[in-house]
Regions:
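Noncatalytic modules at the cell exterior or secretory-pathway interfaces
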Residues: 48-52, 87-105
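Structural signature of tandem-repeat unit edges
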Residues: 37-43, 81-89, 97-99, 109-148, ...
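Short proline/glycine-enriched turn/loop motifs at strand-loop junctions of beta-rich domains
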Residues: 45, 55-63, 239
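Periodically patterned hydrophobic/aromatic "hotspot" residues that form packing/interaction faces
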Residues: 6-10, 19, 152, 156, ...
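Tryptophan-centered short beta-strand motifs
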Residues: 3, 74-76, 189, 264
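Enriched but not universal
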Residues: 1-53, 266-271
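Short beta-strand segments and strand-loop junctions that repeat across beta-rich extracellular domains
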Residues: 53, 62-76, 98, 248-261
């Protein structure tokens, strides 16, 4: 019998509301979150700001998204290439900020639309809420077509506030440059999202975690990394030691910044 088998408990004829084993609550238990059913979310760890800004380019390539802080209503914001007028969200520790949008890509070649700011946070939830808006629940892949490139390129570029991204749910496929520089120079990032895509296309992960100097955990289930530049410098200048979890059938990872960092422990995933 497991905790989930318990539907009710009694002490004599009196109902029991909680059961402890020592000091640990063993019933009722809270089921783990289903991160795929949650929009992209930041759990705030320190007071500060979240800024939605454009890095380079002109106002013609800005992007509009929506955010919700705690139980407030959804609010639309549009990125700006001018930092002084870029939308800014003030946050405190414990705040929950969620995001959604309907943009196929957040990098137009000449510009990147990025999250920056001064707060520290953990990120989790379904990244596809930024592409499919309210309809992300039934989607598991990036859109196809010629305009579906650079989807999340540079999205967290140089964001020093993001600490743990391991519970961001990523798509099952890749597109050209889809995650190029996505976490570039995120100097305090420790854990990367699980990367489920089997086949990497041209430049898909190029410089994805370049100069994430504290990054020490990566789980990548790719089995085909033959495309040009698909992992070029993707793990350049990360932590000196760490853990790399790979697909058990994948035996062709190179060693170094374009593959598995030297001196990292390699583990086969359970698939």
């Amino acid at each position: 019998m497991t905790n989930s088998d318990i539907t009710a408990a009694y002490y004599g004829v009196d109902p029991v509301s909680k059961i402890y084993l020592g000091g640990e609550l063993v019933w009722p238990t809270t089921p783990p979150p289903v991160y795929s059913a949650i929009p992209l979310t930041f759990k705030i760890l320190s007071a500060g700001t979240i800024m939605w800004r454009q890095n380079g380019g002109s106002t013609s390539t800005t992007k509009t998204i929506q955010y919700k802080k705690n139980d407030d209503a959804w609010v639309s914001i549009t990125s700006s290439p001018t930092v002084s007028v870029a939308p800014t969200i003030s946050v405190q520790p414990g705040d929950i900020v969620q995001f959604k949008g309907t943009n196929i890509r957040y990098n137009n070649g000449s510009s990147q639309n990025i999250f920056s700011g001064t707060c520290s946070f953990n990120a989790y939830g379904n990244i596809l809420s930024l592409i499919y808006g309210d309809n992300y629940l039934n989607e598991t892949e990036l859109p196809s077509g010629n305009t579906s490139t650079k989807n999340f390129s540079g999205l967290f570029k140089q964001n020093m506030g993001i600490i743990d991204a391991s519970n961001i749910i990523m798509p099952q496929n890749t597109t050209w440059y889809c995650y190029e520089e996505m976490f570039y120079y995120c100097g305090n990032l420790v854990k990367a999202p699980t990367l489920p895509a089997a086949t990497l296309v041209y430049a898909a992960y190029q410089q994805m975690f370049d100069n994430c100097k504290k990054l020490n955990y990566v789980k990548c289930l790719a089995t085909n990394i033959s495309a040009t530049d698909c992992t070029s410098s993707w793990l350049n200048q990360v932590a000196a030691t760490g853990t790399f979890v790979k697909h058990p059938n994948m035996t062709s990872w190179p060693s170094g910044k374009d593959g598995i960092p030297r001196n990292w422990t390699v583990i086969d995933a359970t698939v």
